[in-house]
Amino acid sequence: MKKYLLGIGLILALIACKQNVSSLDEKNSVSVDVPGGMKVLVSKEKNKDGKYDLMATVDNVDLKGTSDKNNGSGILEGVKADKSKVKLTVADDLSKTTLEVLKEDGTVVSRKVTSKDKSTTEAKFNEKGELSEKTMTRANGTTLEYSQMTNEDNAAKAVETLKNGIKFEGNLASGKTAVEIKEGTVTLKREIDKNGKVTVSLNDTASGSKKTASWQESTSTLTISANSKKTKDLVFLTNGTITVQNYDSAGTKLEGSAAEIKKLDELKNALR
């Protein structure tokens, strides 16, 4: 009898080692940090199906899943009180996470992709599951917001917000973002392609003497000229700020030091 009970105890112990994700804790799992400030618990042992159990809690919803890997990657799912579904997908190399909320019938409501560099893309969908809004936050904290979207490549409204709250407004057409700021007859435009490449230009509709500008991609510098003389450089830094520096009266060399533009009015003043 003792041997029998011992055998039963051993079997139960083995089952406990192979139990499902609902019982994961700090003793039988490892916590893995994934992009988005989330943690995924990964079982130390494989379950009866030869996979690692996964568990995470997102917005008070318990998500569960399994994976062939023990690094935290995989797909986890859970259900909210209103029966909508939450799905978390962690990339194999842990480089990004995709968090989705879906209706009970599977229609997507929202999606947020977070990369390791903390850049994010958040998308919202209408009742039919069609893309309607999208916000992209770069690693430097600047944003691109799209609304009134008809598909992934077209939006009636686009707003880019750089550091210091400086906003450029425009639209998204055929995958290219075109946003601008106007001051009098001068328009400062930023064009952003699908790969994130930025081109800055200036257009002046004045009837008399017009300002012109040349863009140097390698230094992200827009050199503005008037009456065939260079007047100032606008530099769009990688941290999301803009600086301005004036040329001497001859327009041959920069003088003083570059100053950070901290207000929209300061940028508009630089365009005058």
UniProtKB/Swiss-Prot annotation:
Gene Ontology cellular component list: cell outer membrane; cell surface
Chief subcellular location: membrane
Pfam families to which the protein is assigned, alphabetical: Lipoprotein_1
Annotated localization: Cell outer membrane; Cell surface
Signal sequence residues: 1-16
Xref: PROSITE patterns: PROKAR_LIPOPROTEIN
Membrane topology: Lipid-anchor
Keyword line: Cell outer membrane, Lipoprotein, Membrane, Palmitate, Plasmid, Signal
Lipidation, N-palmitoyl cysteine type: C17
Annotated SUPFAM superfamilies: Outer surface protein (SSF51087)
Lipidation (S-diacylglycerol cysteine): C17
Gene Ontology biological-process entries: adhesion of symbiont to host cell surface via host glycoprotein; cell adhesion
Family: Belongs to the OspA lipoprotein family.
Protein name: Outer surface protein A
Protein's organism: Borreliella burgdorferi
Protein's gene: ospA
